[in-house]
Amino acid sequence: MNADMIAAWAVENGFQAIDSGNYRRHDNAGVITIEIKRMSFLLIDERQGLRPRLISRLFKDIPLTSGSGRLQGLLLDRNPKH
């Protein structure tokens, strides 16, 4: 993965560009922010009433073949099944 792939994934999944390398999405559960760095990205999950969850990954640790699936996996538990 690389910064361009993360940015494309963010836009495809409803994130709005805040500025260069930063994307944000609002939904009923709260706010998710993605900050793209030079060699990594930081996902900040701010759910209403809970402490923010920070997830940082190096691009080299996310294989190209399953990159978008792994990114989606980081968001899966946002809306737990009841």
Q: Predicted segments — roles?
A:
Residues M1-R24:
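Negatively charged, low-complexity tracts enriched in Asp/Glu with abundant Ser/Thr
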Residues E12, Q16, E35, E46-Q48, ...:
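Glutamate identity and glutamate-enriched acidic tracts
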